[in-house]
Amino acid sequence: MGGSNMVVVESLNKVCREGELEHNYSYRMTKGKISLSGYENPIELQSYGIEIERQDIVKGDIINIERDFVKDISCQRYKVHKLLRLLYDNSVSPIHLIDIIGEYIDKYIEDFDNQLKEIAIN
């Protein structure tokens, strides 16, 4: 595995309160590269992913942090942005990330194939 350095390209934040408990949510779109081998020369495509972090805070102290991410969801930034908004608008917790976006991931995997076909044609 090469150094997969992901860069955060968009971040949406919100705070939800339940009595004394405060949840700080961060929804981030990450950008990286996916390397596809099996060709004469390995092909690198731009890819976008999502990371969600939730900090649970009581009286200013962080008592718990949950985080999960999925990289390489699609090479189409707008699709991942829409997913990010969906998660943000519904205050989705990191622990539910995979449940919510699993079916999208299965669909969007085709984007990489389509991108490869375009490269092959040109």
Tell me the role of every PLM-derived stretch:
Residues 18, 39-41, 69:
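Residues embedded in well-ordered secondary-structure elements
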Residues 1-37:
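Negatively charged, low-complexity tracts enriched in Asp/Glu with abundant Ser/Thr
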Residues 34-36, 57-59, 78:
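Generic "edge-of-domain/loop-turn" microfeature
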Residues 25-42, 84, 94, 98-99, ...:
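A positively charged, amphipathic N-terminal helix/segment that binds anionic biomolecules
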Residues 85, 89-122:
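C-terminal charged interaction modules
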Residues 62-77, 82-89:
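A short, exposed loop/beta-hairpin motif centered on an aromatic-Gly-Thr core
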Residues 42-67:
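A short, structured beta-strand/loop element
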